[in-house]
Curated annotation (Swiss-Prot):
UniProt keyword Repressor present: yes
Region (Disordered): 1-20, 284-320, 335-373
Protein name according to UniProt: Unconventional prefoldin RPB5 interactor
Similarity section: Belongs to the RNA polymerase II subunit 5-mediating protein family.
Biased composition (Acidic residues): 296-307
Coiled coil: none
SUPFAM superfamilies for the chain: Prefoldin (SSF46579)
Native organism: Bos taurus (Bovine)
A molecular-function term among this protein's GO annotations: phosphatase inhibitor activity
Keywords annotated in UniProt: Cell projection, Cytoplasm, Mitochondrion, Nucleus, Oncogene, Phosphoprotein, Protein phosphatase inhibitor, Repressor, Transcription, Transcription regulation
Subunit structure: Homodimer. Component of the PAQosome complex which is responsible for the biogenesis of several protein complexes and which consists of R2TP complex members RUVBL1, RUVBL2, RPAP3 and PIH1D1, URI complex members PFDN2, PFDN6, PDRG1, UXT and URI1 as well as ASDURF, POLR2E and DNAAF10/WDR92. Interacts with POLR2E/RPB5, RUVBL2 and RUVBL1. Interacts with PFDN2, PFDN4 and STAP1; the interactions are phosphorylation-dependent and occur in a growth-dependent manner in the mitochondrion. Interacts with UXT.
GO cellular component entries: cytoplasm; cytosol; dendrite; mitochondrion; nucleus
Function, in words: Involved in gene transcription regulation. Acts as a transcriptional repressor in concert with the corepressor UXT to regulate androgen receptor (AR) transcription. May act as a tumor suppressor to repress AR-mediated gene transcription and to inhibit anchorage-independent growth in prostate cancer cells. Required for cell survival in ovarian cancer cells. Together with UXT, associates with chromatin to the NKX3-1 promoter region.
Lineage of origin: Eukaryota, Metazoa, Chordata, Craniata, Vertebrata
Length: 524
C-alpha cells in the first residue's frame, strides 16, 4: 500500500536539509558556554590566591624574621629564615621587578583583584547570552524535526523581470516628470486608447499653463516703475524704458494664447487697463518709491479690492504695464549735533530739505516752499545756521557767527579784513555796555522776517548771502566815521534795531541795524 502524497512537499524537503545546520549551530554555542565556564573557574582561583596573599602581606611586618621551609626543586624543601619582612619585590610584567613595602603591596593586590572581578563579570554576561541562544536553537530544532509544526515559505523571483527604475534627479521648477520614467511597466492588452489620449491632452494642457505662468512671473519680476525716487532725487534711465517696452510686447504675446483669452473675458470690459489705480499710491521697490495718481477716482470705485489684485497681475495697456509696488515708510533719522557749551540740537537740515524736495516733486512742482515753523527757542537755531563745505552747521549762538567766511549773512569782501582788527576792541566794548535783552529779541524777530521773505521765493532761486554795507555802532569822533567801503559788520548775523541812547559820554552814538544801514546807504 502506497503512502498518501504529502500536501507540503517543500516543508518535508527542507527539514532534513536544515537539521544538520541547526545541530552544528547548537554545538558551537555549547562550546562557547563551556569555554566561558572554564575561564570563570580560572579567574575565581586567581581571585582566591590574591585574597590569601593580601592576608599574608597584612601580617608579615609583625615580626622581624620568620622560620620557613624554602622549596628546593619540585620535591625538596630545606629549612630557612625569612628576613626583611617589610620589603616586598613586585613583578610589574615582562620580567620587570620593583621593591615596595608590605602596605604598598597590599594596595597593588587590591587593584589587581578589581581587574579579576571585572573579567569574571564579563564572562558571566557572555555565558548567559549564549545559554539563551542554546535554548532557542533547541526549540528551533524540535520544531524542524516535528512534521507539520513549521512551514517554510519561499518566494522565487523570475530572472526575466527587470526593474528599470532610475535614481531620482532634482528637476527644474515648473517642469513635469518625464513620461519615460513613469510609464515603464507594460500595459494590459485591454487598455483603451481613450485613456492614453486623455493623458496626452492633460499633459499638453499642463505644459501650456506652465509656460504661461513662467511668462507672467518673469514679466512681474522684470517690471519696474516709470519714475524712481531715491534719497530725494529722481532716477530714471533709458534701459528701464526699453525693458518696459519689451515687457509690453511679451504681454501681447501672452494674450494671444487660448488660456489667457478665456481668463481675460471677464476683465476686458473693465477699466483696469487704463494704467491707473483708484487713489494716488506711493510704492517702491528695494527702497525706491514711485507715484501713480488717478484723476478719475469716482470711475473705479465699484471695482474695489478686486481691481487692485487683478491690476497687479493682469493689467495691460498699449504703452505701459501698471504695476503696484509696496514699501514701508521709515521715519527720517534725526541727527544729534553738539553745537558747543550748553546747546545740543536734534535735527538734520539735509534730511528736511530732501523731504521737502520729495513732497514738491510728487505734487504739482510749483508749490511755494513752506515757511519754517518756530514754536520753541530750539527752532530758532534751525534758521540761524552757517554754511561749512556746502552743509548747514548750527551756530553756538545766534548772537555771533562761527565763521565769517561761511556765514549765511556774512560779507566776505576783501576790504572787510583791513579794518576788522582795529575796530574789534572798540566795538565790543560799546556792545557790552549798550546791549540789552530787548535788543536781542527784536533783532531775532527782524531776522526771521527777512528769512520769511527768502522762503517765499521759488525753489529754483538759491538764497544769496547779504552783501550790502552795514553801519555799526561807532564813536562820535569824525576820525572814526566809517567809510562806505570799509564799514563791515563785526557781528554779521546780529540784526539790530535803531535805538536812541542818552548821551552820557562823548563815546556814545546812535545804534543802527545793518539792514537799515544798507537801505539808508542806497537812498543816499
Amino acid at each position: 500500500m502506497e503512502a498518501p502524497p504529502d500536501p507540503r512537499p517543500h516543508a518535508s524537503a527542507a527539514a532534513p536539509l536544515r537539521a544538520p545546520e541547526v545541530a552544528r549551530l547548537r554545538e558551537e554555542q555549547e562550546k562557547v558556554v563551556t569555554n566561558c565556564q572554564e575561564k570563570i573557574q580560572h579567574w575565581k582561583k586567581v581571585d582566591n590566591d590574591y585574597n590569601a596573599l593580601q592576608e599574608r602581606l597584612s601580617t608579615l611586618p609583625d615580626k622581624l624574621s620568620y622560620n620557613i621551609m624554602v622549596p628546593f626543586g619540585p620535591f625538596a624543601f630545606m629549612p630557612g629564615k625569612l628576613v626583611h619582612t617589610n620589603e616586598v619585590t613586585v613583578l610589574l610584567g615582562d620580567n620587570w621587578f620593583a621593591k615596595c613595602s608590605a602596605k604598598q603591596a597590599v594596595g597593588l593586590v587590591e587593584h589587581r583583584k578589581e581587574h579579576v572581578r571585572k573579567t569574571i563579570d564579563d564572562l558571566k554576561k557572555v555565558m548567559k547570552n549564549f545559554e539563551s541562544r542554546v535554548e532557542f536553537t533547541e526549540d528551533l530544532q524540535k520544531m524542524s524535526d516535528a512534521a507539520g509544526d513549521i512551514v517554510d515559505i519561499r518566494e522565487e523571483i523570475k530572472t526575466d523581470f527587470e526593474f528599470k527604475a532610475k535614481h531620482r534627479i532634482a528637476h527644474k521648477p515648473h517642469s513635469k516628470p518625464k513620461t519615460s520614467d513613469i510609464f515603464e511597466a507594460e500595459f494590459a492588452n485591454d487598455l483603451k486608447s481613450k485613456d492614453l489620449l486623455a493623458d496626452k491632452e492633460l499633459w499638453d494642457r499642463l505644459e501650456e499653463l506652465e509656460r504661461q505662468e513662467e511668462l507672467l512671473g518673469e514679466i512681474d519680476i522684470d517690471s519696474k516703475p516709470d519714475t524712481v525716487i531715491a534719497n530725494g532725487e529722481d532716477v530714471s534711465s533709458e534701459e528701464e524704458k526699453e525693458d518696459q517696452n519689451i515687457n509690453v510686447n511679451m504681454m501681447h504675446q501672452v494674450t494671444d494664447s487660448l488660456a489667457l483669452s478665456s481668463c481675460y473675458n471677464s476683465l476686458t470690459n473693465s477699466e483696469l487697463f487704463n494704467g491707473q489705480v483708484n487713489s494716488p499710491l506711493n510704492y517702491s521697490v528695494n527702497g525706491s518709491s514711485s507715484y501713480h495718481s488717478n484723476e478719475d477716482d469716482g470711475d473705479n470705485n465699484d471695482d474695489g479690492g478686486d481691481s487692485e489684485n487683478d491690476h497687479d497681475t493682469l493689467g495691460v495697456e498699449d504703452n505701459s504695464i501698471p504695476t503696484i509696488y509696496f514699501s514701508h515708510t521709515v521715519e527720517p533719522k534725526r541727527v544729534r549735533i553738539n553745537t558747543g557749551k550748553n546747546t545740543t540740537l536734534k535735527f538734520s537740515e539735509k534730511k528736511e530739505e530732501a523731504k521737502r524736495k520729495r513732497k514738491n516733486s510728487s505734487g504739482s512742482g510749483h508749490s511755494p516752499q513752506e515757511l519754517p515753523m518756530i514754536r520753541t527757542p530750539a527752532d530758532i537755531y534751525r534758521v540761524f545756521v552757517d554754511v561749512v563745505n556746502g552743509e548747514y552747521v548750527p551756530r553756538k549762538s545766534i548772537l555771533k557767527s562761527r565763521s565769517r567766511e561761511n556765514s549765511v549773512c556774512s560779507d566776505t569782501s576783501e576790504s572787510s579784513a583791513a579794518d576788522f582788527d582795529d575796530r574789534r576792541g572798540v566795538l565790543r566794548s560799546i556792545s557790552c555796555e549798550e546791549a540789552t535783552c530787548s535788543d536781542a529779541s527784536e533783532s531775532i524777530l527782524e531776522e526771521e522776517q527777512e528769512n520769511h521773505q527768502k522762503k517765499l521765493l521759488p525753489l529754483s532761486v538759491t538764497p544769496e548771502a547779504f552783501s550790502g554795507t552795514v553801519i555799526e555802532k561807532e564813536f562820535l569822533s569824525p576820525s572814526l566815521t566809517p567809510h562806505p567801503a570799509m564799514a563791515h559788520p563785526v557781528l554779521p548775523t546780529i540784526p539790530e534795531r535803531k535805538e536812541v541812547l542818552s548821551e552820557v559820554s562823548e563815546g556814545t552814538t546812535k545804534r543802527v541795524s545793518k539792514f537799515k544801514a544798507a537801505r539808508l546807504q542806497q537812498k543816499n
